[in-house]
Amino acid sequence: MSPGYLPAPKAVLGSVPEKHLAEEDEVDSILLSASKILNSSEGVKESGGNEPEYGCASEPENQIQPQSALKVLQHQLESFQALRMQTLQNVSMVQSEISEILNKSIVEVETPQFNSEKSLVFSMHPEKDLPNETQEEIPSTKTLHSMGETFSSNSDTGLPQGTDIPPQIQVKDMLALQGLRTTADNSPPKKAMNTSEQPSATKSFSLYQFLPQGPQTAVPQAAPVILDKSTITTPFPKHGFCANLDDICHSIKHMKEELQKSHDKELALTSELHTFQADASTQGHHKHEPFPMHSSKLNFIQQENMEGNLSEDMKSKRISELEALVSKLLPLRDTVSKLHVNFCRKCKKLSKSEVYRGKKNEKNKDIPITSKNIMDLKFHSRAPRYTLSVLDLGKHKIKDKEGQAFIVSQGPATLENEKLPKGKFIPEQCVPKQSVAKIHYLQNYLKESLQNQKKMTELENENLALKTKMKPLVFTAQSLIQKVEAHEKQLKSLAEEKSALQSKLSKAEEENKDCLRELKKIVSTYNVLGGQHKMLEEKNSQLSLEKQQMLETIDHLKSKEHKSQSDMAVLQNENSRMNIEIEAMKTSMLLVQDEREMLEKETYQLLKDKSTLESDLKESKLEILQLKEKERLIKAEQESLLHSLDTAKAEKLSLEATLQESTSTRQKLERKLVDIQAYQSAAEEKFLKEIKSAKSETSIYKNNLAEISKECEILSKMVMEIKADNQILKEELKKHSQENTKFENSISRLTEDKILLENYVRSIENEKDTLEFEMRNLQRDYLSLSDKVSSQNNSASKSTYISRREKLYFDNYDAYEDASSLRNRPVASDLKGIPHKLYQRLPSKICK
């Protein structure tokens, strides 16, 4: 399609209300936020799964328990992420359900408002009051109804019978409806119908009309009316592209009430005919020609009866078509909300060769919609809306042409007098051809892509089978190659050894002496290595001691790990709190599911009402057939009575009386119609209130969604905080490992200092032993000297005089030596053999 035929985006978007666009944008934003949350959760999961176990390579024995703590943390994180994924899945389910509810509330359509005063006119007027278009009214209704039938047949039988129709193929019906609505909104009214033809048009288009008509311009009576989809101004709903099932059911009920009214009218007519029969039986022997005025009135009655039968047939057909539409729309309520199918912008860029290619392949009309095609259509769903409306317009004009052909085949007499200039319809004929070519090109492109996909899947399956067959062969070949390489290496080594042995054997005599020398050197080196081995064993013993010391330091670190475990307990408490919040979210989800079940129950009740309506329709059809048979009998009797009625003036008076009675009955019926219209308006107000309540519920669901998204963000923040805590713990583990190395170095230094101190203590103990030995010798000398002094005192008196001075001298000398020894010995209890009196005198004598 050339870009010149594209409508302006504003013109197309003008038919769509701004509320509908705003709500769709809100739904898209909610879905985008949910997809972002899901992607972030997947990224968190991947980052959490790919976290390296830090600090496990260098010192495994020192970090066994930190590894276990990290594993516990990772398990907790994985469980928390699994719970989070479940909550996100539940949130996505709630979002999908809310989007369905939003689509249902967006698709609000008012019930059809029929012009009851014009559609149910059963009064008997003379021929002077009749318009010229009464003869054209019946074929117009036929043509309009045939157009509705062709539309429904095209929407029903879109695929060939050989192909299996998937459930997604029913989207074409909705696309056709959308195309019809866009064409009706965008096409200017070329020739509107006359005011006398409005009831038939409203009746024939009741499948697609759910709002009162706009202003219509009158046409002169001589000009015929072309019943094309673009010429008729059919208003469509303001709130969406799809009809609401509740409104359709209400329209079915309204039409059923009209049928009952028509039945009542027919019963009244039959009663009048029975009165005619009674009058005719009294005056049956009189046979005269009818008066012209009576004949004209009776012809008008016949025409009115024919019109009533046709209108009843039209009503029954319309009700059946509405029920078929309802049966189609019920399974599509869930799928259409998810599949707002928009075509790609590539439709604008088709070349002339591609158009020619599409014209050649006109026979291949329909392609089964597969899951891949649906994904492609979803991928291109962000295209502008005017491309979709243009393509739907092209599709619908193809169906209009088929409907026009069907109209011409049924009623050629009505279309002979229709003459309009051809120049007005040239662009309308060019547009469908190009749209047909583009549609066929897209269908062929989809078919080729499907065939390529099938081939690719078959080749991939064959490749997988061959790979599975090749795997054991590859393993066996690799094992054989490895064995051959090993054998070749062995053969090479054996050949080299053989050559070396031959050379050695040739030089054995010369090298024996050198070998003996080398053996001696080897023995000497062996002895040296034995000494080194002993040294290494001693070093190993020292290392074992150091290992014990390290174990003690590890015990010290375990105490620190207990603290970290207490911190982990705090984290577990936080996790339990998060689990409680998740359970609360689950309860809210259960409430949403209960509400969904209530909605499903309401739909089930609607289906039951539909089945009852269908049974009532069947009964009404049977009654209509019986009434038709009765009317035929009555008409035959009327023809026999006409000759007798003309002769009697009394019969004229009775006919006038019956006419007055019919007018009175007509007035009563009109009053009843007014009451029914009032009841209908009250029912419409009730339905509007229910729709408002549904909108408020959707707003509540949106708020719940926003709260759930906020809670998901809070959960993601908590996960990020836990990750940060893990990183902090890892850094602390690094610090602890560094401190362990420092402690090890300090322990090695302390061991060296300890060895030095032990050596120093041993030297001090040796000195102590030597001093004790000297003290004992001095005590012995002291005792011997005291004995000598006592013996000398006993021997002579002179010696007694001098002995006191000598005793004091020796006492002072011993006290001095004891004081010098006490400077090296801080404890006085170790001085054995010294008298207590001398020990008490020491400070005074040292001061002297």
Curated annotation (Swiss-Prot):
Where Phosphoserine occurs, the residues are S620
What are its GO cellular component terms?
Answer: nucleus
Where in or outside the cell? Nucleus
Chief localization: nucleus
Keyword ATP-binding belongs to the record: no
Which keywords does this chain's UniProt record carry?
Answer: Coiled coil, Nucleus, Phosphoprotein
Q: Does the keyword Translocase apply?
A: no
Top-level taxon of the source organism? Eukaryota
* Coiled-coil regions listed: 442-794
Disulfide bonding pattern of the chain: none
Q: Where is this region: Disordered?
A: 41-62
Give the matching PANTHER family: CILIA AND FLAGELLA-ASSOCIATED PROTEIN 58-RELATED, COILED-COIL DOMAIN-CONTAINING PROTEIN 110
Q: What is this protein called?
A: Coiled-coil domain-containing protein 110
Which organism does this record belong to? Answer: Mus musculus (Mouse)
- Taxonomically, what lineage is the organism? Eukaryota, Metazoa, Chordata, Craniata, Vertebrata
